[in-house]
Amino acid sequence: MNRTKIVLGAVVLASTLLAGCSSTAKVDQLTSDIQTLNAKVDQLSNDVNAVHTDVQAAKDDAARANQRLDNQVRSYKK
């Protein structure tokens, strides 16, 4: 995610440097593209956080299931 922000920062810097050589329409288009990319990065970040939460819940469920199985095995050994 940090790499993406660095790339986006470079795009902003490049568009700023090219502003003297470019028309306003091109600069506005680049700004719009950057805003779109920032929105996509934010959405992907939210998706990753949601997946992380789901993975943690699955790990917790697996640990509880393993504990139940361990308890059943112990009761059979007695």
Swiss-Prot record:
Pfam families: LPP (PF04728). A lipid is attached at C21 (N-palmitoyl cysteine). It is found in: Cell outer membrane; Secreted, Cell wall. Residues 1-20 form the signal peptide. Sequence repeats lie at residues 24-34, 38-48. The modification N6-murein peptidoglycan lysine is found at K78. One of its GO terms (biological process) is periplasmic space organization. The keyword Iron does not apply. The keyword Cell cycle does not apply. Its main location: membrane. Residues 27-75 form a coiled coil. HAMAP family: Lpp (MF_00843). NCBIfam families: Ala_zip_lipo (NF040598), PRK15396.1 (NF011925). A highly abundant outer membrane lipoprotein that controls the distance between the inner and outer membranes. The only protein known to be covalently linked to the peptidoglycan network (PGN). Also non-covalently binds the PGN. The link between the cell outer membrane and PGN contributes to maintenance of the structural and functional integrity of the cell envelope, and maintains the correct distance between the PGN and the outer membrane. This is Major outer membrane lipoprotein Lpp. It comes from Photorhabdus laumondii subsp. laumondii (strain DSM 15139 / CIP 105565 / TT01) (Photorhabdus luminescens subsp. laumondii). The lineage of its organism: Bacteria, Pseudomonadati, Pseudomonadota, Gammaproteobacteria, Enterobacterales.
